[in-house]
């Protein structure tokens, strides 16, 4: 089970170029464009699911998140660098709506793989220096059947569609293992084609790194120190902080939606 250590912040659109220049100068590296489609599903309420395990311990139902990378050729732009982020000012992402609507129903050998993950609620405590969250992740490379899709795969697992969003932005891969993301998010409202900007007039900032084992305290402490050092280096530009852990709770019945 991977432990993800992270810090978050936000900036307005006018601060984007300065932040890119700052991180480029600190790291000596160039930003990389990325785009992904995300679908969050929840357990089917029509199923009578036991809420205790074999040891009679309470087990809470959890949402699952599916993520698929969006190929750059699907972006409605001729700019395939971080500069695209400065042009994303509307209520919808620069991606074909028809393509986004088809992703959950696509099937066949040409379908791109999906990342399937479960996120635990972040660790509690007054003295936390970073957000620490356990993540279980797998890859769905294909689904069986003549008319299979990721939707039918979820249904067989006992899950039904929840909500969808698109994330598009740029990221730096820092030498100490930290991934520094600057991105925009859009919520997708079914197959109507309607979208709404979650990060309107600004960008979400996330700095994170993954530790393969929760028992590797040395790596966790080292990762925490790296994130704290980055926080100090950027204190004149933005405030990296720990979000409210309740907003990152993926358990059913807890606030976690847009």
Curated annotation (Swiss-Prot):
Gene3D superfamilies: Hypothetical Protein Pfu-838710-001
Keyword annotations of the record: Activator, Nucleus, Transcription, Transcription regulation
One GO CC term, this protein: core mediator complex
GO biological process, one term: positive regulation of transcription initiation by RNA polymerase II
Molecular-function annotations in GO: transcription coregulator activity
Subcellular location: Nucleus
Pfam families from the UniProt entry: Med18 (PF09637)
Main location, first listed in the record: nucleus
Entry's family note: Belongs to the Mediator complex subunit 18 family.
Oligomer and partners: Component of the Mediator complex.
Function noted in UniProt: Component of the Mediator complex, a coactivator involved in the regulated transcription of nearly all RNA polymerase II-dependent genes. Mediator functions as a bridge to convey information from gene-specific regulatory proteins to the basal RNA polymerase II transcription machinery. Mediator is recruited to promoters by direct interactions with regulatory proteins and serves as a scaffold for the assembly of a functional preinitiation complex with RNA polymerase II and the general transcription factors.
Name assigned to this protein: Mediator of RNA polymerase II transcription subunit 18
Organism of derivation: Eremothecium gossypii (strain ATCC 10895 / CBS 109.51 / FGSC 9923 / NRRL Y-1056) (Yeast)
